[in-house]
Regions:
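A short beta-sheet element
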Residues: 62-63, 75-131, 150, 245-249, ...
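Sequence-specific dsDNA recognition surfaces
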Residues: 31-81, 218-236, 248-287
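Structural detector for helix-capping/boundary residues
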Residues: 16, 28, 129, 152, ...
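Short, recurring structural edge motifs at helix starts
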Residues: 2-5, 16-20, 70, 134, ...
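Non-catalytic DNA-recognition/assembly elements of restriction-modification systems
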Residues: 13-41, 205-233, 240, 364
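A short glycine-rich beta-alpha junction/loop motif
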Residues: 10-14, 88, 103-109, 142-165, ...
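Short, solvent-exposed loop/turn positions at domain surfaces
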Residues: 4, 21-24, 67-73, 143, ...
């Protein structure tokens, strides 16, 4: 590929092009390139669902509990493979391509290209930042949850067009890149599945063996003081006292939290933390549980490491605990996030819309305590697997960033 000059407003050329292509691109009004198609009365066709960023999928494969009246299917719109769909969330995610023929909601607008083209070319273009945030945004009407794309405004938007042979080159590149990203994502999911199975195997074997002690949580762990600072009382960056927020425990942190390497929010300087004694500040080996969640992820925890010379407190909706005995670093982090331990928590969870677990309940659970050598072995195995998963995630991000960069440079 070669870098070329940017558009001067008269001749439009992308910044990056495949060899052999130098002709300027044309820009047509959307209605000149695409026909607004309304083709109804096909109730026997496959009902399709929009998956943002992925196009269409047969409704029964979408994994969603969507209710609809069979009698209304005659009013649904027919789409052909390669058509484009303006759906209810297009204002934030772009247009989606029909991956197969079928019928879709009558609320959608169906676009069919009038000129020779590559559908994958426009599928890529309709997901670029330039199109969504600088072009499509001109056709958005309404505010907040009422936002939608007005076709009457959309049809006047300028849409680029180049020779089909160049479109094919560009679409082939993104097809290969998308396939590579999909495989990388599958690798991450496979590694996570393997990790869960390995964790189950390791701790189930410990529970069945005679070389481990089974101890009561309340006899092994001391519950520490936590604070109730909200997100508004925290800042990202700085050298203040770190704060472990329950939302980060649930979503951001893994079984182990390294305070030296993780960017943990700090408590704003104007907040009074004088009531917290030295014993309240987190140390290596302490474990922080999230005691509230919107689902059964409640009880997720993270073990603290890298706490040397770093002041950190446990925050809102957390249960910070300190082991009374010596444990191998990271062992408790992996044990408390194992299915073996979580199964003990499930009967203790309270609430309907919001799930929670109390300190008085968690102290009744049991901890498997093998010898230090076995603890170290388990922690080492699980940590190495986490490193492998993190590396695979970073590769996924790098590939997505590469795709994003190419999307910006290969289109005008």
């Amino acid at each position: 590929m070669a870098n070329v000059s940017s558009s001067n407003g008269l001749e439009k050329r992308p910044k990056l092009r495949f060899p052999g292509f130098d002709e300027p691109w044309k820009v047509f009004k959307a209605e000149e390139l695409f026909q607004n198609v309304t083709d109804k009365n096909h109730p026997d066709e496959t009902v399709l669902t929009i998956i943002q960023g992925k196009g269409t999928l047969p409704r029964e494969q979408a994994g969603r509990n969507i209710h609809y009246d069979d009698a209304s299917l005659s009013n649904y719109k027919k789409v052909e493979q390669g058509d484009f769909i303006i759906h209810l969330r297009s204002f934030e995610g772009g247009l989606e391509m029909a991956n197969e023929a079928g019928i879709v909601s009558p609320a959608y607008t169906i676009l069919r290209c009038k000129r020779p083209h590559s559908s994958l070319f426009y599928d890529a273009y309709f997901h670029t930042d330039e199109f969504i945030n600088h072009n499509l945004s001109k056709s958005v009407e309404g505010i907040r949850d009422g936002r939608q794309i007005s076709y009457e405004a959309f049809k006047w938007l300028g849409i680029p067009y180049c020779e089909p042979t160049e479109q094919e080159q560009i679409s082939s590149l993104f097809s290969v890149l998308n396939e590579r990203i999909a495989k990388q994502r599958n690798l991450v999911e496979s590694l996570k599945k393997y990790k869960r199975g390995l964790s189950n195997s390791l701790f189930d074997r410990l529970s069945a063996g005679s070389e481990s002690r089974l101890c009561i949580f309340g006899d092994m762990m001391t519950i520490l003081q936590n604070n109730t600072f909200s997100r508004d009382n925290l800042s990202v960056g700085g050298n203040g006292v770190r704060n472990i927020h329950y939302g980060d425990v649930l979503i951001k942190y893994g079984a182990v939290l390294d305070l030296h390497s993780e960017n943990v929010p700090v408590i704003n300087a104007e907040q009074d933390i004088s009531k917290f004694s030295a014993l309240s500040y987190l140390r290596n080996g302490d474990v922080v549980f999230a005691d509230t969640a919107e689902d059964y992820t409640v009880g997720k925890s993270t073990e603290i490491i890298g706490a040397e010379n770093i002041a950190a407190l446990s925050g809102l909706h957390t249960i910070p605990c300190r082991p009374q005995d010596s444990f191998a670093p990271m062992y408790l982090g992996y044990y408390f996030n194992s299915d073996y331990f979580k199964k003990q928590l499930y009967p203790m969870i309270q609430g309907t819309k919001v799930s929670s677990i109390s300190k008085s309940e968690i102290i009744k659970t049991k901890i498997i305590v093998p010898c230090l050598q076995e603890q170290t072995r388990i922690a080492s195995i699980m940590s190495a697997l986490d490193d492998r998963i993190d590396a695979a995630k970073h590769t996924t991000k790098d590939l997505i960033d590469l795709r994003s960069g190419l999307l910006q440079q290969l289109f005008i």
